Amino acid sequence: MKDNAKSAQHCRPLAPIHAEVPKCISRRAFLQSVAAFAAGRAFAAPPGVFSVGTPLLSFAAISDIHVSARKTSPKYGTKVFEHALGWYRAQGVDAVVITGDLADNGLTEELEMAGAAWRKVFPGNKGLDGRPVEKVFVTGNHDHDAWNYGMFAKERHPDPADFEAHKLASHYPECWESSFGDRYAPIGMKTINGYRFITSHWDKGDLRQFGPRLKKFLAKHRDELSGEKPFFYLQHPHPLGTVYGPTFAARGVCDDGTVKEALAAFPNAVSFSGHSHWAITDERAIWQGDFTAVNLGCLARTGFCRTRNAMNGYENWRTPGARKKIKAALEADGLKAMPHYGPSFVCHHGSLVKVFADRIVIERREFTHDRPVADDWIIPLPVAASRPFAYDVREKAAVAPEFPSDARLTITESTANNRKKDKVPVVVLSFPAANAVSGARPYDYLIEISGGNGEKLVRSVLAQGVELGPDSQTASGPSKCVLARDTLPAGPLEFSVRPGECFGALGRALSGRL
């Protein structure tokens, strides 16, 4: 993209959305997208369609950069962070938003490394054209608590006094100011180009800390925050009951629900959070109800939401009731032969947010191949008038992904390592990407196994390359499911594989026998 030259007064006229057709799409597709937006039907569009014109505000939106002082860690150093910042600088952003976990191990030197990277890319806190670029950062659990995650921090600083001197949680105010030149406050607010950003830090080892102080803050600033103009709220964990579902609270990635209660009175609020590391290619990463909530994913490494088909996937690694003895369960569970979906260090997610008078555009991309990973999200303004990202709306509009007409399911018998590294007999199912329907992307595949004895099993696997762009070589390639042979029913076996998208729409099945 070309640099955006912006006036020193930060006052820019709104360009009509039909001003030009992005080179990446046809004029027909462009006009169809514009018509859908005007009719209130659009919630996504090909990258760039609604970014034409000069925004009133643009900012980087990333989370979980996890700068690590551990040289053996794949997160070591600031290379990815600097690369991402450099791209955002080239876009002429007005600000950079980071929703926590700047430091990986809760050490002062890691926050200082992040600060040095910022100054390297934005010297004097200025962009390419000399305008100021604001820092809008909050802390996360790794900043506050990760000194106690494992032994690295204590082994790096074995002397108790030296350790205490480098424990970030004990020195938030002074280290924050020395690293970023900003005053630290548990909750605060910045105004950029007339738009307000509320920042709420993780400064206690408790997910219940955010709601009570936000309620007080909103009450104090109600008059300036009320109305149709959007404001942005930042915290590290997802507000409970927003992204990924109304009841989702898996393993502490959400707060206690009081933030949702506080923001419910402000339909113009847009919440940004991280913490889960879950891929922003998952369409459940944006939610609308009484306000709007967005997951920013993870710059350091990408993870995957496992709320669907809970005990049947995606890792297929744990038996019910075994959570207190995870290691033993990993070794004992016959499902352990299935692929393990650990964090992907080859995919680094981030977003670019552009605010116009009638819309907010969120461009999603990854910084390994420097490409978009999905359609842009388009939030109509004012947000109270239209909620295209409400889950019930999107479920009704969901289009099931489909396999190509010549697709075939391949079934082979082989051996594979289990989690104990023992070779075990397995059945391998291979199938092509279900990318035959434009705009319908597979998130996972539902696998049904029927035995000759009448027994049935259900398993699921994530689509290959689901964290990357749909046209990437990885995402366009085949997926597979590896099943431990001794977990399958006896007798002749029948297999059925159906592609599914994030909201549950399932395509037609590929079938086969063994």
Language-model-derived ranges and their functions:
Residues 1-25, 36:
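N-terminal secretory signal peptides
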Residues 46-112, 249:
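N-terminal active-site segment of His-dependent metallophosphoesterases
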Residues 53, 318-451, 455-459:
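A short C-terminal boundary segment appended to hydrolase-like catalytic domains
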Residues 62-63, 96-101, 134-141, 233-236, ...:
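Active-site neighborhood of phospho(di)ester-bond hydrolases with catalytic His/Asp-centered motifs
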Residues 107-220, 224-226, 250, 254, ...:
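Extended active-site neighborhood of metal-dependent phosphoesterases/phosphodiesterases
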Residues 444-488:
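Recognizes extended acidic, P/S/T-rich segments that occur
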Residues 487-504:
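Beta-strand-rich modules
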Residues 504-514:
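Extracellular fibronectin type III
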